[in-house]
Amino acid sequence: MFVENLRWAAAFAPKQKLTIEPINGVDMPGYFLNDFDLAMDVLAEIDAPNLFLQFDAYHAAKIIGDVLGTWDKVRARTAHIQVGGVPDRAEPTGGDFDYPAFFKTLDKQKFQGWVSGEYTPAGRTEENLSWIS
């Protein structure tokens, strides 16, 4: 049903970029799209020019552990990136993943999609946006 619905949505809104997002099963038990390989298989099966991946680096770290390796495999089909600190979904400024290096990689690769933060700030949001620069 998921594939049929996505196929319909992609055909219904051909000028819109649609995304699907793998989410780790620890944070969202029972969520069926909890694997990047499965997400890429879905994109290949539907083969719609307006259907892309939403790459959440936090979920990649929780699902696979190898964020950069996963990114290399999926970047050609990615339209939107989300970031959040690993392992606690805090600001993407510390923790178990080197976000500054990842952002440099995105710049070097000339990534043209969206990058957004999805995390729980330690304090006021305005005080915790240094990662953007």
Where are these regions (language model features)?
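Hydrophobic faces of well-ordered beta-strands that scaffold small-molecule active sites
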Residues: L18-I20, L51-F55, A79-V83, G113-G117
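Distinct, well-ordered alpha-helical segments
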Residues: M28-I46, A61-R75, T93-D96, T125-I132
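Active-site-proximal loop/turn and secondary-structure-junction residues that shape catalytic pockets
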Residues: P22-V26, A57-H59, G85-P87, Y119-G123
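Acidic (Asp/Glu)-rich catalytic clusters
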Residues: R7-K15, L43-D47, G69-T78, P100-F111
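Aromatic-rich peripheral "rim/lid" segments of glycoside hydrolase catalytic domains that contact
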Residues: T105, Q109, T120-S133
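Short glycine-rich, flexible loops that bind phosphorylated cofactors or substrates
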Residues: A90
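Active-site acidic/histidine proton-transfer and metal-coordination neighborhood
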Residues: M1-F52, K62
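Structural motif corresponding to the early beta-alpha repeats
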Residues: M1-E4, Y99, Q112-A122
